[in-house]
Amino acid sequence: MGSISPLPLTPDASCCPREVILEKYQQERKKRQLNCVPDNEATELHHKYAPVQGVDQPSYTRSPIITDSKVVIIGGGLAGLVTAVKLKTQGINDFVILEKGAECGGTWHWNQYPGAACDIESLIYLPLLEETGYVPQSRYSSGAEIRAHVARIILKWNLGEHICPLTQVTSTKWDESKLRWEVQTDHSDSLTCQFLVLATGLFHEPNLPRIPGSERFKGDQFHSGRWDYAVTGGDPAGSVPMDKLATKTVGVIGTGASGVQIVPRLAQDAKKLYVFQRTPSSITARDNYTMTPLMTEPVIQKPGWQRARMVQFCEMLEAEEHEMSDKDGTVAEGFDALSLRKVLNGMRKDDVAPAQMGELYARADISLMESIRKHVSNTVDDHETAEKLKPWYPFLCKRPVFQNDYLSSFNRSTVELVDTNGQGVSCLTEKGVVANGKEHEVDLLIYATGFDYEIGTPFYQRTRIHVFGSHGQTLDDAWADQGPSTLFGIHIRDFPNLLYIGPCQAGVTFNFTHTIYEAADHISHVIGDCLKDGASFQAIQPSIEAQSDWVKQTEEGSEMRLQYAQSCPPGYFNGHGRPEKIPARWGYYPKGIKAWANAMRECRAEGMKGLERW
């Protein structure tokens, strides 16, 4: 139900010639590439504004915990909580959840900025709806609704007694003599466990840019993932205006998914708003509405409805043959990627030669992006501003963003786009931000600059946790040269009884909750089998052959993915403009989430095939 028109297979007659568009793509990429220097070191801003004990974290002291458990789960986000529920379903109650935040919720705990919302249909994104009996209020849930559902899950399964909040794990180490993991924390805890689950999440460790002069700025500044309502007024639910901004000039650096959601609310409440842009996002409208019983009852009647709906969504995006009614189809409405997937599927069915497939796909991609650029022109009144807001790159180079009010915010006289022509801001002064050689005075500066994403980023950098395996080697050292080696993206050789949840080498779709479900199912069944009465083994790890085969499968098609990434402007999808520096092993499982889930089910059905046991 988005405003983007259906995708034709060739560009409209009104489009620029294809060669002109591709040349424009290259020009825009090159100007950003020259100014993009990845930096894995923590900045002064990071130390000052992104600590866990930050503006939204109370001080907390407690006595050290010394205990042995069957399972320790690191992370109380959706992945950690769903895994805990699945463990309970297996009859396993001896587990601890270590969460660095004041509350559980992961991404949704940290990202409490105004306007925070999910752009995946709530019926498939909010986990355990069928089990809790909860029906979402909106088609796309707000952050507040998601956090309330997290609390509902914790209450229903009595997970509160398992959770240790405000606890940063500092190191974990496998003790081969005891077949136990040793876990250390910032509270001097000493925990041991048979199984260690890393559910450390994707979007929680702020990525703060190294901007000269940041320490000189005299105004308030914070990252969007550490929003300070004491400075802005208002609340995470958006129930009251940010009244403290009525007399303030605000600057936002970053126009990715977070920035796009934040800007409309700031535009309403701030006296003046500057939006500093390096690269525009591709913006698609998204219909959100209140869910009525008339809409939801036909969906939720059959047992297993939520899992089935997740599968329907992934089948549509993977363009498989699947008979669907119009009601089923609403699960993926607005997903422009669906059009491109169908183009690919059609070419496969027609046995189009690989050389021709690239050409036809590129034409379809250009057509879609022309529709998105036309949407900008139709929404933004000022022609010059509209031109600067148009994305000039292939569709999936950057995360697509679905938001109705972002583009129209620039029709307000109080909102000004500061496009940096791909260069980013130059520096900060005591009074504000210098961009394009001009100082823009601001009272408040907000960094909507994203997070340290998993792909290509050292585990310690993202989590502040050292993970030592059976030979004393850290996980980062093991993956340093060639990238990750795993089985299913979950099991890691030389790290026995370690179970990892993340996108790397796993099946991934736009709905990451589906990935969490499949991973948690596998993890809980594997642990359950190991803990059965009479089990003859206490530890597992993937065999050399099984892990090598899985890595080889992950690397398949890497050359095509690399070529695509090299055509994109810098961003976290392509290693900030250096995709050749990221080994192919960091990729997702290329055969899709259904094939990934089937491979794990086959492993379990065949007596944990591919796993060594002792």
Swiss-Prot record:
Transmembrane segments: none annotated. SUPFAM superfamilies: FAD/NAD(P)-binding domain (SSF51905). Its cofactor is FAD. Baeyer-Villiger monooxygenase; part of the gene cluster that mediates the biosynthesis of penifulvin A, a potent insecticidal sesquiterpene that features a [5.5.5.6]dioxafenestrane ring. Within the pathway, peniC is responsible for the final regioselective Baeyer-Villiger oxidation of gamma-lactone-2-keto[5.5.5.5]fenestran between C1 and C2 to form the delta-lactone moiety of penifulvin A. The first step of the pathway is performed by the sesquiterpene cyclase peniA that generates the angular triquinane scaffold silphinene via cyclization of the linear farnesyl pyrophosphate (FPP). Its EC number is 1.14.13.-. The keyword Flavoprotein applies. The lineage of its organism: Eukaryota, Fungi, Dikarya, Ascomycota, Pezizomycotina. It catalyses: gamma-lactone-2-keto[5.5.5.5]fenestrane + NADPH + O2 + H(+) = penifulvin A + NADP(+) + H2O. FAD binds at E99, T107, W108, H109, W110, D119, Y125. The record marks R399 as: Transition state stabilizer. Disruption phenotype: Abolishes the production of penifulvin A and leads to the accumulation of gamma-lactone-2-keto[5.5.5.5]fenestran. Belongs to the FAD-binding monooxygenase family. This is Baeyer-Villiger monooxygenase peniC.
